[in-house]
C-alpha cells in the first residue's frame, strides 16, 4: 500500500489508492471512523460484483450509527479483506492501513470531487470554521479536530 499522501479522498469519506498492479484499494477516512465510533460490523460488497462510481456498495456499522460506503470508481470487486470481516474493529485501529475491498479498474478516475489529503483536511474543518467565524468573527482558528483551518 502506498503512503497516505497518495490517497484520493471522496467527500463521502472513502479513500482510494491505486497500486502498481492497477487495483484500487478502498478504505474509510480517519474522520469517518472517529465519527462512527467503535466499528462492530462490516457488510462487504460481493466478490466479482460490478460497481458503478458513486454507488453505495457496502455498509459499516458501529454502536452509534451505520454508514454506506460508496464506490470511488466503476469496476469489479476483485478482493475483500477477510481480516476486516473477522475483526471489523481493525478499521478503528488503523483506518489508513486497513483496506476494505479492491476494485479492478485500470485507470483511476474518481467521482467528482475527490481531494488529496491536504484538501480533504480543509473540507473536514469547513463546518467548524463557519461556526467559529460566526461566534468570534475570526477567520483562522484551530478546529476541535486539531487541524488548522
Swiss-Prot record:
Entry's cofactor comment: Binds 1 lipoyl cofactor covalently.
Protein name: Glycine cleavage system H protein
Presence of keyword Calcium: no
Keywords: Lipoyl
Gene Ontology biological process terms in this record: glycine decarboxylation via glycine cleavage system
Gene that this sequence comes from: gcvH
Function: The glycine cleavage system catalyzes the degradation of glycine. The H protein shuttles the methylamine group of glycine from the P protein to the T protein.
PROSITE patterns tied to this protein: BIOTINYL_LIPOYL, LIPOYL
Amino acid at each position: 500500500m502506498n503512503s497516505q499522501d497518495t490517497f484520493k479522498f471522496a467527500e463521502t469519506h472513502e479513500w482510494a489508492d491505486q497500486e502498481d498492479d492497477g487495483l484500487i484499494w478502498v478504505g474509510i477516512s480517519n474522520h469517518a471512523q472517529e465519527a462512527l465510533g467503535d466499528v462492530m460490523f462490516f457488510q462487504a460488497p460481493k466478490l466479482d460484483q460490478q460497481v458503478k462510481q458513486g454507488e453505495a456498495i457496502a455498509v459499516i456499522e458501529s454502536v452509534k450509527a451505520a454508514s454506506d460506503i460508496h464506490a470511488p470508481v466503476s469496476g469489479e470487486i476483485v478482493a475483500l479483506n477477510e481480516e476486516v470481516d473477522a475483526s471489523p474493529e481493525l478499521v478503528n485501529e488503523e483506518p489508513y492501513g486497513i483496506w476494505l475491498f479492491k476494485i479492478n479498474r485500470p485507470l483511476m478516475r474518481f467521482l467528482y470531487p475527490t481531494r488529496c489529503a491536504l484538501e480533504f483536511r480543509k473540507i473536514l474543518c469547513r463546518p467548524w470554521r463557519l461556526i467559529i467565524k460566526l461566534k468570534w468573527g475570526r477567520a483562522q482558528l484551530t478546529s476541535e479536530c486539531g487541524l488548522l483551518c
